[in-house]
Amino acid sequence: MFIDRLIENIKSKKSPVVVGLDPRIEMTPQFIKDIAFKKRGENIEGVCEALYLFNKGIIDAVYDIVPAVKIQVAFYEAYGIEGFKAFFKTAEYAKSLGLMVIADVKRGDIQEVAKMYSKAYLQNQLFDAITVNPYMGEDTIMPYVEDAIKYDKGIFALVKTSNKGSKDIQDIKTTKGEYVYQSVARMINRISNSAIGKYGYSSIGAVVGATYPEEAKVLRKEMPNCFFLVPGYGAQGGTVEDIMDCFDENGFGAIINSSRSVIYAYQTPYWKDVYSEYEYAQAARAEVILMTGMINNGLVKRKYIAC
Ligand SMILES: O=c1ccn([C@@H]2O[C@H](COP(=O)(O)O)[C@@H](O)[C@H]2O)c(=O)[nH]1
């Protein structure tokens, strides 16, 4: 099952860190752009080649120390068909090195449309899991759940997102006296019963932001079946302490995504005097090792088992 494979990958890499491949052309090292533009021209094709080459460097540097990568489709979709090619090529390369691939596509929509989104991603062998948006209601996520079970894939449903504005709707109190995100959490946890693996977690998981540690603590209890995909670590302000309550005492229960803080580590105050732009991938590796060490130390301090 997807979730068992994910847990086994976390165990074998001894890391719950997911690297987010969200490349920006304006932050891409010049030497990569030079290579890409020379090969494909200083145009959309060249830009997309540069994004792919950048990702390839990161993947080469981290594939042996993380269980998965998360690829945010917006950074590719912005460039049309060439962007999509870079998106698929990135997924293909990550898979070829044994990484699990989460497509961050946050899909939703009415059932008939959701079926087509699901066909695009969950029926595609390149992707192990996708993110979905359940805020249109249960019927809209069932096509993804059905395909996840049928094709042995995973889904992570948005429950409490990491952005500031997540409170605008997700934190409204319902007539039952709970927050909207808790109602969504209850729905997802119930649905997730249909896909529980041998470690007690389901292939139907939840997105819970690192920037809301109190809410995450509540949700960990209210969603015992659901593995959390936790964005918001690093660049958005989430810290190791903030994510601790996403884990269970066996050191499972969560994968922690970091995109900018890892892929652009060489530009951060911590690493910028150590690594040049030519060494951006080594900097990303160093940041993942540091992040993994800090998370595992945090787990040990709590007397939880480290990953
Ligand atoms: O609640 C959410 C859900 C998804 N994301 C995604 O995670 C990364 C975060 O990038 P950073 O550079 O580490 O901030 C990005 O792909 C978002 O789409 C999120 O941030 N919050």
Curated annotation (Swiss-Prot):
Q: Which GO terms describe its biological process?
A: 'de novo' pyrimidine nucleobase biosynthetic process; 'de novo' UMP biosynthetic process
- Superkingdom as given in the UniProt entry: Bacteria
Q: Tell me any Pfam family this protein matches.
A: OMPdecase
Q: Could you tell me the keywords of this UniProt record?
A: Decarboxylase, Lyase, Pyrimidine biosynthesis
Q: Which reaction does it catalyse?
A: orotidine 5'-phosphate + H(+) = UMP + CO2
Report the InterPro entries cross-referenced here. Answer: Aldolase_TIM, OMPdecase_type-2, OMPdeCOase_dom, RibuloseP-bd_barrel
> What SMART domains would the database entry show?
OMPdecase
Query: According to its UniProt record, which residues of this chain constitute the active site?
Result: 106
**Record pathway:** Pyrimidine metabolism; UMP biosynthesis via de novo pathway; UMP from orotate: step 2/2
Task: Give start-end of the signal peptide.
Answer: none
User: What EC number(s) does its UniProt record assign?
Assistant: 4.1.1.23
GO terms for molecular function, please?
orotidine-5'-phosphate decarboxylase activity
Q: Which family does it belong to?
A: Belongs to the OMP decarboxylase family. Type 2 subfamily.
Q: Which NCBIfam families does the entry link to? A: pyrF_sub2
Q: What is the name listed in the Swiss-Prot or TrEMBL entry for this protein?
A: Orotidine 5'-phosphate decarboxylase
Print the organism lineage: Bacteria, Bacillati, Bacillota, Clostridia, Thermoanaerobacterales
